[in-house]
Amino acid sequence: MRINKYCWFFSFSIKLFSVFTIIYLAFLFPIKAHHKIDNPTIKFSESPEIRNFFFEWRGHINLDRKKENHETYHQVLEFVKGWNKRYETDFELHIADLKNSSLAIPKVKFQNKYNFINNKNFLFSTFFSFNLATEKNSSDQIEYKFLFQNKFKYFVFNNGFGFYKNINGKNSKNTVLKYFPLIYFKKPIISDINLAIAGSSDFGKISKFSTYTNQKHQYGLGIKKTFQKNTPREIDLTIAYLKGLNSKSFDQSLIWYVNKSF
């Protein structure tokens, strides 16, 4: 009985810590940045109880030795509609704390994802987005990605290659390449909490890659927990920590994801 009591207390403490961490990240820091690792999975269910609408709130805070980068942040509200097993559309509002406004929406994204291959252990999808810039000196952007997923016995490996091209402004001729890997371990480490290794690499312009010291690389660990699992109130929470690998990257970033289906 005593062991069960301690196990229950530890499980409850983990849940409570996760909730307070999210509240702390969301409201205590003044926030300017954005991480997302897309995967080729289409959010769609044939269950009549699910309307195939999905909502995600995510963001991250940068901790950096440079004063202009320290405690900067960026949040995203994403709305997803799954139309069938092959196709979904996404709408994103990017919310940032800018110098001339306490709350601004510097970017709006209109996205489409289509799945081409959906085998037992391998998925491949393409992703296209038109990114509308709302700030005066910013450029609209076309973003497209090739997304892969390999399923192994003990883990799932997602990796995506993203291409970003400004379609107006002085940098409109440049296309930037980014890489987003994620390894998700199937077996929970404790109390239905799963571990993941994730990161992002910005190689610069594909016409002439930046040298390593001028690239941006961040990698680290994350944990995922599903609350109220298999109930109408089910919600996913992910918290991650990324470490910059070179001087051009942010020293550290704290990331959160909250997902809910309807």
Question: Model regions: which residues?
Answer:
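Cleavable N-terminal export/targeting peptides
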Residues: 1-38
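Transmembrane beta-barrel domains of Gram-negative outer membranes and organellar outer membranes
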Residues: 31-171, 176-262
